[in-house]
A protein has these predicted regions:
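N-terminal loops that bind phosphate or other acidic moieties
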Residues: 1-150
Length: 150
């Protein structure tokens, strides 16, 4: 008899255009599917209330009862503000703005069972921050300014 998977924090990615779906697909190509996850794509012509409803439906889809982590693309944007509407006291929710591929790879490879959304969010936020690097920091080489640029 197979044992049931332990409940874990659900993941919703809310982005402009199809960015969220592309990030999930890229993570799956690299490391395998990100469990208990879905994406919501927001288009410019969409009414804000419709975005909020779709984000809520996505949260319902991945909620196993332990809470939701929502990753948005841009702080302060319509997708991000729609995510804020999910913080309504009905279930544990945390939101992180600035989603990137290293965050999703971390989520695909870490065990989210037994953790609260805020704990998962802190881990993912740190991975996202550490993944942003300048090439010159890594190589010690800097671009040479060209004289013809004004």
């Amino acid at each position: 008899m197979a044992t049931a998977e332990p409940a874990q924090v659900g993941l919703v990615i809310v982005t402009h255009g199809g960015c969220g779906e592309c990030l999930l697909a890229a993570a799956a190509d690299i490391i395998g599917p990100v469990a208990s996850s879905t994406a919501v794509s927001v288009v410019p012509s969409e009414a804000f209330d419709d975005i909020v409803r779709r984000v809520g439906s996505a949260c319902d889809q991945v909620d196993s009862g332990v809470g939701i982590l929502i990753l948005a693309d841009v702080h302060g944007s319509s997708p991000f503000r729609a995510c804020l509407a999910m913080v309504d006291g009905t279930r544990p929710v945390e939101i992180v703005a600035g989603v990137n591929l290293p965050m999703l790879i971390k989520l695909a490879t870490c065990d989210r069972s037994g953790l609260r959304p805020a704990e998962v969010a802190e881990r993912v936020k740190e991975v996202g921050k550490r993944s942003i690097r300048l090439g010159s920091e890594l190589t010690g080489k800097f671009a040479i300014p060209r004289e013809d640029h004004h």
